[in-house]
Swiss-Prot record:
Gene3D superfamilies: Ribonuclease H-like superfamily/Ribonuclease H. Possibly the antitoxin component of a type II toxin-antitoxin (TA) system. Its cognate toxin is VapC4 (Potential). InterPro entries: Piwi, RNaseH-like_sf, RNaseH_sf. It comes from the Archaea. Keywords: Toxin-antitoxin system. The gene is vapB4. This is Putative antitoxin VapB4. The lineage of its organism: Archaea, Methanobacteriati, Methanobacteriota, Methanomada group, Methanococci. Signal peptide: none annotated.
Length: 57
């Protein structure tokens, strides 16, 4: 999780070059949101995470 968060600090949400456009996959964006929520002392229901819910969006 920390690695994904560190990747978001690179600020490469979109890359441009020579007529090409590349977007970073959404999981990195959502990992950033998740880590920030944990930093705000959110209480995380582990059962919801087991089922794949992304309730921190």
């Amino acid at each position: 999780m920390q690695l994904l968060y560190d990747l978001t600090k690179m600020n490469y949400s979109a890359l441009y070059g020579e007529g090409r456009y590349l977007r970073i996959p959404a999981p990195i964006h959502y990992a950033d949101k998740f880590v920030k929520a944990l930093g705000k002392n959110w209480k995380i229901d582990e059962e919801l995470l087991k089922h794949g819910f992304l309730y921190f969006i």
